[in-house]
Amino acid sequence: MATPVVTKTAWKLQEIVAHASNVSSLVLGKASGRLLATGGDDCRVNLWSINKPNCIMSLTGHTSPVESVRLNTPEELIVAGSQSGSIRVWDLEAAKILRTLMGHKANICSLDFHPYGEFVASGSQDTNIKLWDIRRKGCVFRYRGHSQAVRCLRFSPDGKWLASAADDHTVKLWDLTAGKMMSEFPGHTGPVNVVEFHPNEYLLASGSSDRTIRFWDLEKFQVVSCIEGEPGPVRSVLFNPDGCCLYSGCQDSLRVYGWEPERCFDVVLVNWGKVADLAICNDQLIGVAFSQSNVSSYVVDLTRVTRTGTVTQDPVQANQPLTQQTPNPGVSLRRIYERPSTTCSKPQRVKHNSESERRSPSSEDDRDERESRAEIQNAEDYNEIFQPKNSISRTPPRRSEPFPAPPEDDAATVKEVSKPSPAMDVQLPQLPVPNLEVPARPSVMTSTPAPKGEPDIIPATRNEPIGLKASDFLPAVKVPQQAELVDEDAMSQIRKGHDTMFVVLTSRHKNLDTVRAVWTTGDIKTSVDSAVAINDLSVVVDLLNIVNQKASLWKLDLCTTVLPQIEKLLQSKYESYVQTGCTSLKLILQRFLPLITDILAAPPSVGVDISREERLHKCRLCFKQLKSISGLVKSKSGLSGRHGSAFRELHLLMASLD
């Protein structure tokens, strides 16, 4: 008789490279537990099917990193908020942009779809919460009350309330119909990262960076219990669908809690690090985590997890006898949510204000929607998920099969971390992954959307060179094409690269010694002139980095020499050069632009004033150079990320030049 195979309770499913740059947000579809959406610093939203290596769809249109993403309950719509404060809604079935919503003044930290009506709630770094009508492209209401960034938003199951968690250590409950705050729940001593409604009862759970989970009674508006002793900040919690327990995604573990009284039913070790989102499907809990550009998915078999009954660990009352029995989960001690009989009638009665009529101009919306695209990367998976062909419209959707659990003692290996396609310029280090998570299976290389073309700017901080050539720092020399390299030629090529780098560093050292000799005399202007005469931008950057640290070193005659070099730095492909150029230009604009404009606007004086004439000549020269740079700054102000913010700030400072 065959020995039954013992399988694992928790295991790693796969790891993929989800974006060409860092992943900044992700979310699981709660209906199926199989759809994953990721947002990245590359301004894209990518959709994935859990346990499949290929990207299904890539959504473009944002011009700054995507900070928050959320799927609606049927997994037909997705909303994404960016660092610039813009919000975009896509229809996944139609594969197109649905709405662009503008109004927040800072990055979007949290989003949620209304469970029935066509509404979206957004929370921002600007401390405001806004309720949007997707059909009317307008803000229905703005909720004010938090003093810091709003980190999480959740609609109640009946769609009447909205819970918000913020960095100001508070949880607030808002009445959508009345358009006002119902109650504030203080008690946390750190930023509140997540809130979650009980699926049936008037109960709310909140998790905080103070390592506690608090349960709130929504009838009496008071705390029910508090779970203390979490191993780290609480970032992800989820109620079981029948409401019998709460799952907390902790650092490298899953914990199962009850709340009356507070107790821990079970602890499952899962090496997922900082888990970002949880979902339940087929008695399996799916957890996803991200690090840099990698996203990892994990599975916990809930049939082998204690969810009620005997307590295995009690971090709150560990030294007290366990005499209380768990009540029947089916017997509710609180009011039950009453579902509305119609799907959209209740939310439409939301109190409106003057802001509800504010919409983006139609021409602006049309332009945004033209620039937004839904690129289907895998047509087969897309059709299977978003375009199912049921023979009869009443046929229930096909239920996903549970993931098979690997054997407990099998020397399994995880799927190989997918790597970017050859077209991708950014080389990402392969992360070490544990080898005791999933059964051995053929390694699958994933394909991710490849960015088009080389990066405009080479990052200043990186683990390895990215498209960096030492020969870029030397005069261009025509190199004849060579035939296929043999071993001797390869060694010669390696030595040639070494010689090139040696020449670069030797030249840099010599140039810096020359500038330093002049610098020690205390003549800053002559030092800068000598650096410019050397015709090596790297030396100019090193010198400006010193001058920028002490604003008092800047003089008007120094500006006339530096401004042409700043124009070159702003057009460089090296991030450090661009940063130095932006910093220097900002100092010049703040200290000298008012002086330049005042001198140029002043009427001519009577008689001959040589010093005034010299000052006027310098101001005219600086003004001409600033006008030349302003066009470059304006053209780059539409960039995303840090450079875009810096150029937009410079563009505002240079507005008086127009």
From Swiss-Prot:
It comes from the Eukaryota. SMART domains: WD40. Disruption phenotype: Homozygous loss of the gene is embryonic lethal. Mutant animals have dramatically reduced body size, reduced limb bud outgrowth, microphthalmia to anophthalmia and forebrain abnormalities ranging from microcephaly to holoprosencephaly. Brains of mutant mice have reduced cycling and proliferating radial neuroepithelial progenitor cells compared to wild-type, with a more profound loss of cells that depend upon asymmetrical cell divisions. These cells also show evidence of increased apoptosis. Residues 285-437 are annotated as: Interaction with PAFAH1B1. Residues 1-300 are annotated as: Interaction with centrosomes. Residues 1-284 are annotated as: Interaction with dynein. Residues 311-329 have a biased composition (Polar residues). This is Katanin p80 WD40 repeat-containing subunit B1. The lineage of its organism: Eukaryota, Metazoa, Chordata, Craniata, Vertebrata.
